[in-house]
From Swiss-Prot:
EC number: 2.1.2.1
UniProt GO cellular component terms: cytosol
Molecular function GO terms recorded: glycine hydroxymethyltransferase activity; pyridoxal phosphate binding
Bilayer-spanning residue ranges: none
Organism whose genome encodes this protein: Helicobacter acinonychis (strain Sheeba)
Name recorded for this polypeptide: Serine hydroxymethyltransferase
Family to which this protein belongs: Belongs to the SHMT family.
Localization annotation: Cytoplasm
Positions marked as site (Plays an important role in substrate specificity): 225
Function: Catalyzes the reversible interconversion of serine and glycine with tetrahydrofolate (THF) serving as the one-carbon carrier. This reaction serves as the major source of one-carbon groups required for the biosynthesis of purines, thymidylate, methionine, and other important biomolecules. Also exhibits THF-independent aldolase activity toward beta-hydroxyamino acids, producing glycine and aldehydes, via a retro-aldol mechanism.
Modified-residue entries (N6-(pyridoxal phosphate)lysine), positions: 226
Length: 416
């Protein structure tokens, strides 16, 4: 495949190869990123990209769908088995599309959404004013207490005051486990539906390394990449037949047209990988590696939001530091460690600067790095932050980590 690309567009070929080198030589520690399975990439690059298939299996608007019907049906059945649920829609192009489809299916314009505050770890689609959800619906938020944990008592009070039609439990930057049972109790108290957004922790959920959203959530949304290591895409799950029918209509024709059949095939491939025993071993490694990293950083007197982590990510707190999340992001990037600046609870700086960084363990765990490597990485992160303007140190660390990274190739052959 790469041969044809090199011949037809050498510029793009070279840029992809450049990115291939970057991913191999740098330590990818952005919590939402991961290395997908090589088999998933093969499916993504297949001839299925040529086929339009508006509708659903055996209910298409186009002819010639007999093969892609089998592909999508397989993806649906594997998703249902993986998440132990009765209904699955695999057509959502992304996690944001999945969430918007849920709202479109279950809410009316200007209904009320209660989701986690963006600065406390929520996602744009959980009701942020700048997003579609914040414009088409009335959005309200809950947050975390001084300890960095979700304050369920305060969340109940907010829900009783707001009386939302839907409550969203999920996050993009919360280092602790979600208590779905408590959220369902809150939802029942105010007569709301409960949406569990497990985009970040889906891989941990299916490996029994995080609480399961069912039977507590009425509907569950997720991405298929991140901790699942599948292709970029979205997924919606439920055990309610009526909700499932509404979701299907909300995806097509409500918010999308033709599904991406190559992506759906890749999702099916990813789900099969997730069902293997080896994936449980991987998920355990993701958590144990993050525990080691948190331990090292705390021993080096670095402050962490909620004083640690229970999942695949942690947040470093720079509220009382002279440097910002942006400064740390740049310094660590210079040292070959890719993280992202992130707002944190009690944020005082702009979202473009921030007072924190988010660090994840999923991608490096996929490369086979273990607790030994994460201890080294933790010490290097500490060294960089303690002397944040020392460019020569950053370059020295970059070379050290590049040598370590070379022992853990992303892919064992140049697939790109």
């Amino acid at each position: 495949m790469a041969y044809f690309l090199e011949q037809s567009d050498s510029e793009i070929f070279e840029l992809i190869f450049e990115e291939f080198k970057r991913q191999n030589e740098h330590l990818e520690m952005i919590a939402s990123e991961n290395y997908t399975f090589a088999s998933v990439m093969e499916a993504m690059g297949s001839i299925l990209t040529n086929k339009y298939a508006e509708g659903y299996p055996n209910k298409r608007y186009y002819g010639g769908c007999e093969v892609v019907d089998k592909v999508e049906s397989l993806a649906i059945e594997r998703a249902k088995k993986l998440f132990n649920c009765q209904f699955a829609n695999v057509q959502a192009h992304s996690g944001s599309q999945a969430n918007n489809a849920v709202y479109h299916a279950l809410l009316k314009p200007y209904d009320k959404i209660l989701g986690m505050d963006l600065s406390c770890g929520g996602h744009l689609t959980h009701g942020a004013k700048v997003s579609l959800t914040g414009k088409h619906y009335q959005s309200f938020s809950y947050g975390v207490g001084l300890d960095g944990y979700i304050d369920y008592g305060e969340t109940l009070k907010i829900a009783q005051s707001v009386k939302p039609q839907i409550i969203v439990c999920g996050f993009s930057a919360y280092p602790r486990e979600i208590d779905f049972k408590k959220f369902r109790e809150i939802a029942d108290e105010v007569g709301a539906l409960l949406l569990g957004d497990i985009a970040h922790v889906a891989g941990l959920v299916v490996a029994s390394e995080h609480a399961h959203p069912f039977p507590h959530c009425h509907v569950v949304s997720s991405t298929t990449h991140k901790t699942l290591r599948g292709p970029r895409g979205g997924l919606i799950l439920t055990n309610d037949e009526e909700i499932a029918a509404k979701i299907d209509k909300a995806i097509f024709p409500g918010t999308q047209g033709g599904p991406l059949m190559h992506a759906i095939a890749a999702k099916a491939v990813g789900f099969k990988e997730n069902l293997k025993p080896e994936f449980k071993t991987y998920a355990k490694l993701v958590k144990s590696n993050m525990q080691v990293l948190a331990k090292v950083l705390k021993e080096k007197n670095h402050k962490l939001v909620s004083d640690g982590t229970s999942n695949h990510l942690l947040l470093m707190d720079f509220l009382n530091k002279p440097y910002s999340g942006k400064d740390a992001d740049i310094a660590l990037g210079n040292a070959g460690i890719t993280v992202n600046k992130n707002t944190i609870p009690g944020e005082t700086r702009s979202p473009f600067v921030t007072s924190g960084i988010r660090i994840g363990s999923a991608a490096l765990s996929a490369r086979g790095m273990g607790t030994k490597e994460f201890e080294i990485i933790g010490n290097k992160i500490s060294d960089i932050l303690n002397d944040i303007n020392n460019v020569s140190l950053q370059l020295h660390v970059k070379e050290e980590l590049k040598a370590m990274a070379s022992q853990f190739p992303v892919y064992h052959q140049p697939i790109f």
